[in-house]
Curated annotation (Swiss-Prot):
Function: Required for accurate and efficient protein synthesis under certain stress conditions. May act as a fidelity factor of the translation reaction, by catalyzing a one-codon backward translocation of tRNAs on improperly translocated ribosomes. Back-translocation proceeds from a post-translocation (POST) complex to a pre-translocation (PRE) complex, thus giving elongation factor G a second chance to translocate the tRNAs correctly. Binds to ribosomes in a GTP-dependent manner.
Pfam families noted in UniProt: EFG_C, EFG_III, GTP_EFTU, GTP_EFTU_D2, LepA_C
Coiled-coil parts of chain: none
Gene Ontology process terms (BP): positive regulation of translation
InterPro entries associated with the record: EF-4 (IPR006297), EFG_II (IPR041095), EFG_III/V (IPR035647), EFG_V-like (IPR000640), EFTu-like_2 (IPR004161), G_TR_CS (IPR031157), LepA_C_sf (IPR038363), LepA_CTD (IPR013842)
Enzyme Commission (EC) number: 3.6.5.n1
GO cellular component, one term: plasma membrane
Organism: Oceanobacillus iheyensis (strain DSM 14371 / CIP 107618 / JCM 11309 / KCTC 3954 / HTE831)
Key words of the record: Cell membrane, GTP-binding, Hydrolase, Membrane, Nucleotide-binding, Protein biosynthesis
Compartments where found: Cell membrane
Binding positions for GTP per the UniProt entry: D18, H19, G20, K21, S22, T23, N135, K136, I137, D138
Name of this chain's protein: Elongation factor 4
Matches recorded under PANTHER family: TRANSLATION FACTOR GUF1 HOMOLOG, CHLOROPLASTIC (PTHR43512:SF4), TRANSLATION FACTOR GUF1-RELATED (PTHR43512)
Length: 602
């Protein structure tokens, strides 16, 4: 048993987006002969269609590899692949909790970027052994010496420890594998102690129920064992355990340090919580493993099925997605404009887009989503404090004492020639300048405190387009601050459309109102009658525009003839339109709900 544990190595790969993490994982699978040449395809571990299309990793993945070192020792590796995007930090923290080591991949041409730093700090918090790798050294623009110096200066990593590699050209992979055997510690844990296994992910299979991905920290688990979930106290009998070599391979038993899966006829999605500890029902562990901190969503939006009959299917889809995405939150809500739907909370805009696309693809439900918003703290004149994530629920301005909004600390890394544009964008977004550090002759780290509601819209897009794509960006919540905010309502044909309401700073309200009214005028199709589009704060209209009516030429059949006859027909048409306007309702396309997002600041 001791021998079994001695040669297990659990590690993950951390990197900024596009620094070659998934390609390196592919090479490691190839070089350890885990996957044959015939089965190999790019981004092998990114199983979701979405991941392959966008070229990003969204879900973490775990694979078992067998490796024989140059000294002839046999090892079992567990590689846990992690996402690099700021929205998926929780996926990274979950996978790092199951490891003892991390390969830090840095692009030889790009150098250290904001999310590289964020992930390294996470790894250091988890006391992981870090193996630094400079990737893409075969690129013409590679500057390995500069990147080595950056690693030394910024992260305090010894330049001599850095492995130079190119995952694409298969350079340095062997050295990385050898280094893992030398420096990554074996999993600490007692094989004879009561079982403690951490659930770090799970998915739902309609035949087998919930499949839990587990990392065994102490004890062992085999088919037929009675297990208990420590958070819920529910008991189950294990009917299958196994590991992934990306394909699932059934095993008799999982030991200390193993990363694999188990099924136990768990039919209810809520019974297998990510971050929970599994133990034996008849020989319980004294205390649960420290799980994951529950992440609070930062961005909210309404999701409504286009076809109202899909409402229950949408609930089921959200339940399934919540199973392995613990940061997704949702609750039912109704809108006068859109009917029944859900108010959903996400970690960021990319997270929101991905969930929306997964619902549309995997469950075939057409959605209308409203523009995203954040949680505002509203203090009323009677002292009551409300947390409001839906702008249409903002109380009347007369009863509001003050509104506080969430602020984030934004860390922006950028080449020094673009510091000007970055500061300009940040100031425009109501940011407060905090700090600026030169990492070397070329790269600058700029820190701002910015309201989250400004970042939610198009901050990242503007940052990228004004720095030719060179800026990288990471942010974390720092708390709430009072701001002079107002709720803006949009009226179509005199009716308030609740799903189009948004919260805006009073200084920009007039300008924003004008922009959105013009935008909606372009997006909403012309009706048979004239439709006024208005933006209002409370009872005060701040902007208005009219969508002109489509006019049928009623006089076409007249030939020459009398002007009074013409007038009579036009009067008759006008009467008809008046009637229609009273009963007419305006069709609003999906683009109109997102118009709030696409405001150009020019």
């Amino acid at each position: 048993m001791a021998n079994k544990k001695r040669n297990v190595r659990n590690f993950s790969i951390i990197a900024h987006i596009d620094h070659g993490k998934s390609t390196l994982a592919d090479r490691i699978l190839e070089n350890t002969k885990t996957v044959t040449k015939r089965e190999m395809k790019d981004q092998l571990l990114d199983g979701m269609d979405l991941e392959r299309e966008r070229g990003i990793t969204i879900k973490l993945n775990a694979v078992q590899l067998a490796y024989t070192s140059n000294k002839g020792e046999d090892f079992i590796f567990h590689l846990i692949d992690t996402p690099g995007h700021v929205d998926f930090t929780y996926e990274v923290s979950r996978s790092l909790a199951a490891c003892e080591g991390a390969i830090l991949v840095v692009d030889a041409a790009q150098g250290i970027e904001a999310q590289t730093l964020a992930n390294v700090y996470l790894a250091m918090e988890n006391d992981l052994e870090i193996i630094p790798v400079i990737n893409k050294i075969d690129l013409p623009s590679a500057d390995t010496e500069k990147v080595k110096k950056e690693l030394e200066d910024v992260l305090g990593i010894d330049g001599d420890d850095v492995i130079l590699a190119s995952a694409k050209a298969n350079i340095g992979i062997e050295e990385i594998l050898e280094r893992i055997t030398e420096v990554v510690p074996e999993p600490a844990g007692d094989g004879e102690a009561p079982l403690k296994a951490l659930i770090f992910d799970s998915l739902y299979d309609s035949y087998r129920g919930v499949i839990a991905y587990v990392c065994v920290k102490e004890g062992s688990i085999k088919v037929g064992d009675k297990i208990q979930m420590m958070a819920t106290g529910k008991e189950f009998e294990v009917n299958e355990v196994g590991v992934f070599t990306p394909k699932t391979v059934v095993k008799k038993e999982l030991h200390v340090g193993d990363v694999g899966y188990l099924t136990a006829s768990i039919k209810n999605v809520g019974d297998s919580r990510v971050g929970d500890t599994i133990t034996h029902a008849n020989r319980k562990a004294n205390e649960a493993l420290p799980g994951y901190r529950r992440l609070n969503p930062m961005v909210f939006c309404g999701m409504y099925p286009v076809d109202t009959n899909d409402y229950n299917d949408l609930r089921e889809a959200l339940e399934r997605l919540e199973l392995n995405d613990s940061s997704l939150q949702y609750e039912p809500e109704t809108s006068q404009a859109l009917g029944f739907g859900y108010r959903c909370g996400f970690l960021g805009l990319l997270h929101m887009e991905i969930i929306q696309e997964r619902i549309e693809r995997e469950f075939g439900i057409n959605l209308i989503t409203t523009a995203p918003s954040v949680i505002f703290e509203v203090e009323k004149t009677d002292g009551e404090v409300l947390n409001i994530d839906n702008p249409s629920e903002m109380p009347d301005p007369q009863v509001v004492e003050q509104i506080r909004e969430p602020y984030v600390e934004a860390t922006i890394m950028v080449p020094n020639e673009y510091v000007g544009p970055v500061m300009e964008i940040s100031q425009k977004k109501r940011g407060n300048f905090i700090d600026m550090q030169y990492l070397d002759d070329i790269r600058v780290n700029v820190v701002y405190h910015i309201p989250l509601s400004e970042i939610v819209f198009d901050f990242f897009d503007q940052l990228k387009s004004n720095t030719k794509g060179y800026a990288s960006f990471d942010y974390e919540l720092i708390g709430y601050q009072q701001s002079n905010l107002v709720k803006m309502d949009i009226l179509l044909n005199g009716d308030t459309i609740d799903a189009l309401s948004f919260v805006v700073h009073r200084d920009f309200a007039y300008e924003r109102g004008k922009q959105i009214v013009e935008k909606l005028k372009e997006l909403i199709p012309r009706q048979q009658f004239e439709v006024p589009v208005q933006a209002a704060i409370g009872n005060k209209i701040v902007a208005r525009s009219n969508i002109k009516a489509v006019r049928k030429d009623v006089t076409a059949k007249l030939y020459g003839g009398d002007i009074t006859r013409k007038r009579k027909l036009l009067e008759k048409q006008k009467e008809g339109k008046k009637r229609m306007k009273m009963v007419g309702s305006v069709e609003v396309p999906q683009e109109a709900f997102m118009a709030v997002l696409k405001m150009d600041d020019n």
